[in-house]
Amino acid sequence: MSDKFHILLLNGPNLNLLGTREPEKYGYTTLAEIVSQLEIQAQGMDVALSHLQSNAEHALIDSIHQARGNTDFILINPAAFTHTSVALRDALLGVQIPFIEIHLSNVHAREPFRHHSYLSDIAVGVICGLGADGYNFALQAAVNRLSKSN
């Protein structure tokens, strides 16, 4: 049986340090644990999930470009690029793949420079402040949205 939907999960800078980097803000769950849980969830939903974590903006942009034509939805935690990257915004606009922006912490309850996102206004939705669970909610929301449109 072939997968019903193809979803790309992107994680930005420093998320490779999850579990040990400021756990009081980001939790003790590692990125590998988050991705593993999402893969199990996706398999049960007949969804192909691919993943990239990169500290390099260009690698995330290249992955977004490569997704055109073979990806139905993007889940992205742009991390610090949220507040700085017009290039990520332009890449997402360029491929016209719907996406959900994810943040582990509540960015609106943090430093003022974290309150602005270059992506939120073009995202289908934003999930923030729910820790690792936010990824599960985002995957479910993406599949629900795709199922309704097919």
Swiss-Prot record:
Involved pathway(s): Metabolic intermediate biosynthesis; chorismate biosynthesis; chorismate from D-erythrose 4-phosphate and phosphoenolpyruvate: step 3/7
Keywords: Amino-acid biosynthesis, Aromatic amino acid biosynthesis, Lyase
Active-site annotation: Y26, H103
Site residues (Transition state stabilizer), renumbered to this chain: R21
GO biological process: amino acid biosynthetic process; aromatic amino acid family biosynthetic process; chorismate biosynthetic process; quinate catabolic process
GO function term, MF aspect, one: 3-dehydroquinate dehydratase activity
EC category name: lyase
This enzyme's EC code(s): 4.2.1.10
Reaction it catalyzes: 3-dehydroquinate = 3-dehydroshikimate + H2O
Keyword Lyase: yes
InterPro entries xref list: DHquinase_II, DHquinase_II_CS, DHquinase_II_sf
Binding, substrate: N77, H83, D90, L104, S105, R114
Database matches in SUPFAM superfamilies: Type II 3-dehydroquinate dehydratase
PANTHER family registered for this protein in UniProt: CATABOLIC 3-DEHYDROQUINASE (PTHR21272:SF3)
Role of this protein: Catalyzes a trans-dehydration via an enolate intermediate.
The family this protein is said to belong to: Belongs to the type-II 3-dehydroquinase family.
UniProt subunit comment: Homododecamer.
NCBIfam families: aroQ (TIGR01088), PRK05395.1-1 (NF003804), PRK05395.1-2 (NF003805), PRK05395.1-3 (NF003806), PRK05395.1-4 (NF003807)
Name listed for the protein in its UniProt record: 3-dehydroquinate dehydratase
Source organism of this protein record: Yersinia pestis
